[in-house]
Amino acid sequence: MAKNNNIVIVFDFDKTIIDVDSDNWVVDELGFTDLFNQLLPTMPWNSLMNRMMKELHDHGKTIEEIKQVLRRIPIHPRVIPAIKSAHALGCELRIVSDANTLFIETIIEHLGIGEFFSEINTNPGLVDEQGRLIVSPYHDFTKSSHGCSRCPPNMCKGLIIDRIQASLTKEGKTSKMIYLGDGAGDYCPSLGLKAEDYMMPRKNFPVWDLISQNPMLVKATVRDWTDGEDMERILMEIINEIMSSEEGEENDKMLSSENCKISVGIVHEPIQVPLNLVK
């Protein structure tokens, strides 16, 4: 792996790394779409997915059947090379997603990209003793609210980005962040990015629409993308821009340092005075 270049790339998962919503994919592929649509207006999404996992279990669907469905989920062929290239260039990669741990880990392990991510922030998805998947909220809203009116009750991605930024600062890192997402839940974190960061919203998706309503609210440089090929190209361009900028700053520092040494050398060099001028 290349030397760390102080770039942190945060990926949403559904419709960003993969081409579909993993929750909908499992429900549809296992034949529970009608029940899902019936229950959708009655509860938050996270609670609904936990209920759907109970329904799957009650109807005899196993965890292995769920995993088999997840392993055939569609992904654009250029997304995996983009992830591998970014990692090889020294970027730190993280996932922030409103899916769940079992879905994400099953998919990225199957795709062979699990090792490239240093952190996955998502809703816990754990299998109980009866073999049923329990999907819990990332933030337990039954005990307290996370306080963000923009985000669903179980997860504020903006707070997660704030925590990541704070941890990087505590470690003394001056990292630049690149955030990629598609959904309305990715809007809140876009507002927390700094001027030196980059926001990559998927064009004509909810987060792109929200940003387009008032672009001045986002301090970061916004570069939209349409598909995996577009994502790879733009992501590599941004990484190269940041690395070139950092190399230029480093060269400027070295040049400034050399100039300083030369200047000091001239000032302190003994002056040879002709003897006939000595009084």
From Swiss-Prot:
Pfam families: Put_Phosphatase. GO terms for biological process: protein tetramerization. It catalyses: diphosphate + H2O = 2 phosphate + H(+). Catalyzes the specific cleavage of pyrophosphate. The lineage of its organism: Eukaryota, Viridiplantae, Streptophyta, Embryophyta, Tracheophyta. Substrate binds at residues 23, 98. SUPFAM superfamilies: HAD-like (SSF56784). Coiled coil: none annotated. It comes from the Eukaryota. Mg(2+) binds at residues 12, 14, 182. Keywords: Hydrolase, Magnesium, Metal-binding. GO terms for molecular function: inorganic diphosphate phosphatase activity; metal ion binding; phosphocholine phosphatase activity; phosphoethanolamine phosphatase activity. Transmembrane segments: none annotated. PANTHER family: INORGANIC PYROPHOSPHATASE 2, PHOSPHATASE, ORPHAN 1, 2. Its cofactor is Mg(2+). The active site is at 12 (nucleophile), 14 (proton donor). Tetramer. This is Inorganic pyrophosphatase 2. Belongs to the HAD-like hydrolase superfamily. Its EC number is 3.6.1.1.
